[in-house]
Regions:
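Short secondary-structure boundary segments
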Residues: 221-222, 245, 267-268
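Active-site loop ensemble at the mouth of alpha/beta enzyme cores that anchors a bound cofactor
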Residues: 278-283
Length: 283
């Protein structure tokens, strides 16, 4: 499996290939090769800044002579009018890296900002907000980094770092007990140490899990707030609990107050708006 650094390098290479192709002809025809300049990153919307470290890598990979002065770091609260960084170098390099840097930082900052709003709603409870695998293909590591920068907690990264028995797995395996048994047999055979989470859709399935055991976390899928409270009481701390399914900004606090350990929110990554910012020439 690729490391985070390797994934970032591949992303940057692909992004430059699709964006510049055989050349930025607008810049090449208008800007002399030896022209030098300076641009700053202007924040145009309040939020949480994210993507600074990756932006630095974008500049360094495209043109190692570019000088980046970071004024505001990842995770900081920013407001309209703030200057997050100043970049000095060849004007051609400034122009050709502008859009990729903005695409990354706007996307990551939007996710961090959205996540932080959910985190703030959970203050005073023990509940942590989780992301999901509902991410942009190829950008999962970046988007999950942004969730962490915003104060959220990463769920599993992919299909390889946790067992998550969902409804289809259970149905195809012939029921909850069979599915759990097969997981333990597989993990033993492959000498793997992975946590097991199982999704339940109703109280009958919940009781089957409690009777069987052998899991680390129980996901309460599409339970109402009232049923969540009942389920948490029944589980009584024997397993970690996670609420999932249709939970929104307006309803998340109610679920957290029922005592669940985690709440997963797909909207952190699949329905987010980028944070407004621009990269402008300056003196």
């Amino acid at each position: 499996m690729l490391t985070v650094d390797e994934l970032e390098d591949k992303l940057i290479e692909l992004a430059f290939a699709e964006g510049i192709g055989d050349g930025d002809h607008t810049t090449l025809c208008c800007i002399p090769e030896d022209a030098m300049g300076k641009s700053h990153l202007l924040i145009k919307e309040d939020g949480i800044l994210a993507g600074v470290e990756l932006a630095k890598k974008v500049f360094a990979k495209f043109d190692p002579t570019m000088q980046v002065e970071v004024l505001i770091n990842d995770g900081a609260h920013v407001k309209v009018g703030d200057i997050a960084m100043v970049v000095t170098g060849k004007v051609r390099s400034l122009l050709q890296t502008e859009r990729l840097m903005l695409n990354i930082m706007q996307r990551m900052s939007g996710i961090a900002t959205m996540t932080n709003k959910y985190v703030e709603l959970l203050k005073g409870t023990k509940t942590r907000v989780l992301d999901t695998r509902k991410t942009t293909p190829g950008l999962r590591m970046l988007e999950k980094q942004a969730v962490k920068i915003g104060g959220g907690t990463n769920h599993r990264i992919g299909l390889f770092d946790m067992i998550l028995l969902k409804d289809n797995h259970i149905d195809f395996a012939g029921g909850i007990a069979n599915a759990i048994d097969r997981c333990h047999n597989y993990l033993k055979e492959k000498n793997l140490d992975l946590k097991i989470e199982i999704e339940v859709r109703n109280f009958d399935e919940l009781q089957q899990v409690l009777d069987k055991g052998g899991v680390n976390r129980i996901m309460l899928d599409n339970f109402s707030v009232a049923d969540t409270k009942k389920a948490v009481d029944i589980i009584a701390g024997r397993y970690e609990t996670e609420s999932s399914g249709g939970i929104t900004f307006n309803t998340i606090r109610g679920y957290a107050e029922q005592g669940v350990d985690f709440i997963s929110v797909g909207a952190l990554t699949h329905s987010v708006k980028g944070l407004d910012m621009s990269f402008k020439a300056c003196e």
